[in-house]
């Protein structure tokens, strides 16, 4: 895997991706094509199977993913889905620690991203709002990310 550097200077070893739907699946596929060490999770494990077959590992919970990955990306269909994945007892927040990054790519609103970002910061991790534009067809071409910004 090409070396990538986290904001605090340490090398990125692994990326977690939750939400392998129409957009998320294409974005996660791009990470695999670019040789990232990828861990995946979706409500439907059969959706994740092609990623697992192509070298990704499976996370039994969002908490486990947050414990094991340097960056955790969420690409979920609603603010409620984001809140559930983040705040459940076995959610991302339960596994975050200092120096980790949470990148939010979900269909959500600014207030929810800001609220969840504050909870991420409380755990010593860094939240990044990563809006996606252009839908599935642009996600497939790796040309769908808007400029990223801290939450």
Task: Identify the meaning behind each predicted range.
Residues 15, 107-151:
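Rossmann-fold dinucleotide-binding core
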Residues 21, 87, 93-94, 133, ...:
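Generic, ordered loop/turn and secondary-structure boundary motif
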Residues 54-62, 85, 125, 143-146:
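A short alpha/beta connector and helix-capping loop motif
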Residues 59, 79-80, 148-149:
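Short alpha-helix boundary/capping motifs
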Residues 62-74, 79-127:
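Rossmann-fold NAD(P) dinucleotide-binding segment
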Residues 28, 36, 51, 82-85, ...:
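A generic "cationic amphipathic patch" detector
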Residues 2-74, 100, 105, 136-139:
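NAD(P)+-binding Rossmann beta1-loop-alpha1 motif at the extreme N-terminus of oxidoreductases
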């Amino acid at each position: 895997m090409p070396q990538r550097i986290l904001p605090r200077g340490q090398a990125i070893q692994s990326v977690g991706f939750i939400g392998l739907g129409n957009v998320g699946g294409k974005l996660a596929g791009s990470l695999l094509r670019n040789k990232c060490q990828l861990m995946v999770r979706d409500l439907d494990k059969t959706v994740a199977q092609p990623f697992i077959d192509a070298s990704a590992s499976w996370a039994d919970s969002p908490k486990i993913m947050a414990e094991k990955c340097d960056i955790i990306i969420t690409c979920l269909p609603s603010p409620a889905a984001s809140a559930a994945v983040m705040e459940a007892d076995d959610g991302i927040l339960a596994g975050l620690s200092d120096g980790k990054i949470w990148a939010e790519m979900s269909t959500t609103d600014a207030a929810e991203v800001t609220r969840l970002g504050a909870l991420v910061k409380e755990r010593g991790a860094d939240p990044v709002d990563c809006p996606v534009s252009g839908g599935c067809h642009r996600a497939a071409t790796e040309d769908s990310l808007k400029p990223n910004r801290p939450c």
